[in-house]
């Protein structure tokens, strides 16, 4: 398959040479060509990653205390780069698309400046940060939360596909015509998504840090990195204004009281002490029950008494075979006896400004019950 060239015939670039059967013969002449010649678009060859810590899904939350993924890929040799430019799978990014360098940790990624067909490959980080960036989202997974679905512009024309982050359907994704694929950095950094194959379809932008209490910074850094710092300021101002409106209605109810956030996992409880939820709760003036700086700790039924100081417990239950919330040790907790165990929505357990805003309402409604 040949390369499509968008350069004047009087200009020659490395991409021309890469597509020519006479590449070796002409290689020595490269330095003679004008230095002002347009650069070849190497977006589809970008393979840049950086480490991050994330929780991939609910069971990673409750069953895996330290799931970390580090997948580093160095730059390939020049010959491999030239072959990639004319490979059998073309990137759907137009070769004349304007791109820029996005810094992620110590790595650099080349992405379109103004993508027109963005596919969010995961329903949390990828979708929410794409929406916040103002990207035209044209497809996203079925697992997306309702509050995010409502935010997708022109939602009636958007493709919704079956979620399968651990086993993506590359053939289907390649039919979506994406010029940018956005997904959770956690999936990307573990390499479990099929990174090489993804990059043959379109440039990939790994984003976010799932469940982080520092969601403001993560979101702001991302939006600033793509040149949309004004958007970060805008959505944070909207969130802070909403908190300022709701906080006076709940502070009197929660004065001198503590809240805890937990999730059931068969015969254990994951007690979340420093995450997205606790950060939003503290914005509302709630005192969060915690024992240390860890994201979470696991409690067996004999340790449930460590939650006795919680006046209100927000509890998530996605266990497969019965709930520990019916156990005698759980039922003896003061919050359980007082009917102050509030069901929690899984889809609001992590996120950024959009999710934080609706979480404020959920937390307020919970303590007003």
Please tell me what each predicted stretch does:
Residues 195-263, 356-369:
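Extracytoplasmic substrate-binding proteins
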Residues 148, 187-193, 208-222, 256-278, ...:
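Extracytoplasmic ligand-binding site segments that recognize negatively charged/polar headgroups
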Residues 307-369:
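Structured C-terminal subdomain patch of bacterial secreted/periplasmic proteins
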Residues 117-130, 231-287:
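Basic- and aromatic-lined ligand-binding clefts that recognize polyanionic substrates
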Residues 117-119, 124-176, 180:
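A short, structured surface patch at a secondary-structure boundary
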Residues 86-95:
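Bacterial lipoprotein signal-peptidase II cleavage site
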Residues 177-183, 309-310:
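Proline-aspartate-enriched helix->loop->beta-strand connector
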Residues 3-7, 19-65, 76-84:
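N-terminal secretory signal peptides
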């Amino acid at each position: 398959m040949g390369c499509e060239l968008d350069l004047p015939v009087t200009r020659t670039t490395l991409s021309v040479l890469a597509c020519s059967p006479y590449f070796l013969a002409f290689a020595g002449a490269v330095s003679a060509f004008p230095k002002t010649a347009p650069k070849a678009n190497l977006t589809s060859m970008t393979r840049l990653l950086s480490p991050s810590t994330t929780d991939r899904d609910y069971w990673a939350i409750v069953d895996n205390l330290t799931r970390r993924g580090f997948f580093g890929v160095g730059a390939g040799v020049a010959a491999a780069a030239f072959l990639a430019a004319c490979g059998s799978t073309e990137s759907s990014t137009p070769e004349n698309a304007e791109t820029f360098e996005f810094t992620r940790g110590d790595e650099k990624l080349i992405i379109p400046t103004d993508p027109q067909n963005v596919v969010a490959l995961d329903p949390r980080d990828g979708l929410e940060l794409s929406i916040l960036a103002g990207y035209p989202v044209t497809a996203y997974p079925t697992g997306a939360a309702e509050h995010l679905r409502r935010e997708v512009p022109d939602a009636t024309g958007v493709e919704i596909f079956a979620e399968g982050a651990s086993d993506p359907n590359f053939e289907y994704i390649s039919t979506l015509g994406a010029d940018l694929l956005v997904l959770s950095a956690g999936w990307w950094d573990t390499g479990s998504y099929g990174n090489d194959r993804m990059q043959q379809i379109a440039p990939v932008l790994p984003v976010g840090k799932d469940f982080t209490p520092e969601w403001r910074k993560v979101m702001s850094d991302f939006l600033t990195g793509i040149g949309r710092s004004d958007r970060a300021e805008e959505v944070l101002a909207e969130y802070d204004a909403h908190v300022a409106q709701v906080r006076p209605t709940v502070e009197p109810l929660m004065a001198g009281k503590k809240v805890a956030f937990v999730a059931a996992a068969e015969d254990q409880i994951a007690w979340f002490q420093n995450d997205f939820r606790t950060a939003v709760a503290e914005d509302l003036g709630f005192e969060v029950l915690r024992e240390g700086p860890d994201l979470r700790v696991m409690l067996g039924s004999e340790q449930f008494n460590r939650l006795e100081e919680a006046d209100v417990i927000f509890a998530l239950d996605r266990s497969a075979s019965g709930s520990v919330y019916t156990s005698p040790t759980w039922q003896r907790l003061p919050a359980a006896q007082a009917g102050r165990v509030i069901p929690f929505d899984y889809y609001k357990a992590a996120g950024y400004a959009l999710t934080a805003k609706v979480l404020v309402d959920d937390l307020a409604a919970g303590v007003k019950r």
